[in-house]
């Protein structure tokens, strides 16, 4: 993650012949899960079409692999159970490799670097008495807060994170850095004059990867090779520029 990327948030709290051509007729469709209402990573546009950074990276990977992919949007907390049960092939979401997740699913190579941010009123610190922290249910941030014994306010989707702070139900929010981009688009949230700081915890920063069904280990090599190709041929950078105001790889 570049310094320019961090500064942005703290201030505003295929080559020819590769991956082109017809899809392979002998390959069944892959079921890909994305997170519902998690802009700018995955969301529905004005026509109801699923899009976003993670969604379009997944589509590019499918194209490189020459397979047909079917996308389903689910809540963050549903990703791990569905993947571990083999009910989907790929989770196209920025998942940090926590011990619990590694015991249940496989991971592709990283597609971006992630850090977490603590957003709260000045003087409000993690673990402070009386502070309730907004998190997304099923996220690494929720698991961390519960481990610390913090009172948390869990919401179903990233797009709902602003509401607990605006209403006063929560006094802080712990979020992935990229999620903070969308929070800052909410006028009522901006008017709270909250302070954004990088949250220093090894469990909440590092490489973010797609999840892979434990029943489809052969996909790991294919996905990783496709990811390398879209980074080399410029597709990755074009998607990055379309959805994010800074480089994440």
Which residues are covered by each model-predicted region?
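Extended ligand-binding regions for polar small-molecule ligands
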Residues: 52-65, 123-132, 136-141, 205-247
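Periplasmic-binding protein-like
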Residues: 35-37, 112-117, 185-228, 244-249
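Bacterial N-terminal signal peptides
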Residues: 5-17
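Acidic, polar ligand-binding/catalytic clefts
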Residues: 59, 63, 68-129, 193-203
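Ligand-binding clefts/hinges and TM-proximal coupling segments of bilobed small-molecule sensing domains
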Residues: 68, 144-160, 191-194, 225-249
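Pocket-lining segment of extracytoplasmic ligand-binding domains
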Residues: 117-190, 195, 199-200, 216
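Short helix-initiation/N-cap motifs at beta->coil->alpha
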Residues: 38, 55, 70-81, 138, ...
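Short glycine-rich His-centered loop
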Residues: 27-53
